[in-house]
Amino acid sequence: MRVHLFAGMNRISKDIDGWELREVFVESLEYRELLRLRFNELRRPLDLEWTEAEGQADKLDRHFGLYHEEALVGSVVVVALDPGVAKLRQIAVAKPQQGRGVGQRLMIAIENLLVREGVKRLELNARVNVAEFYDALNYQRKGEIFEEIGLPHVKMIKLLRGNESA
């Protein structure tokens, strides 16, 4: 059971430096803020619009924001695939925060949360131009490069907690 500490979000973790990972609930004001970040960083540069089908799919997923001193700086969507397996998607960092370690902080925070929840394997489809970022976080490239939303992507997998069977 989730504890709803706020109308639109659940505080997951907070550190003394003002960084906080929050689960954000669909239809909340905070969710709309996450959508704006995702649109600005992932869709607008490609001239992509938001579709109704994507909105319906979003209702089935979990949404997280990384906040620094109450300002949203990053977001990630978590999709449960199988017991112990999750897919990360729509990973975004606000443009002014890019190149400052925010993406790494976001990934570590979500991985730590998911490990506590029993996830043993993470998957994601990385744009090829940022795959090295995930390489540095110990994600492994799997399979051939493929096209998604008109861009080359590669599937990447990470086994959590040293679990070597997946």
Where are these regions (language model features)?
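Conserved GNAT acetyl-CoA-binding A-motif
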Residues: 107, 114-127
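Conserved acetyl-CoA-binding loop-helix of GNAT-fold acetyltransferases
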Residues: 93, 99-112
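Short loop/turn motifs at secondary-structure junctions and domain boundaries
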Residues: 54-59
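Conserved beta-strand in the GNAT
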Residues: 65, 71-79, 87-92
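A conserved beta-turn-beta hairpin within the catalytic core of GNAT-like acetyltransferases
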Residues: 80-91, 98, 148-153
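Conserved catalytic-core motifs of GNAT/GCN5-like acyltransferases
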Residues: 123-125, 135, 140-155
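Helix-loop element at the rim of GNAT/NAT acetyltransferase active sites that forms part
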Residues: 24, 36-50
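A short beta-loop-alpha structural element at the N-terminal edge
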Residues: 18-34
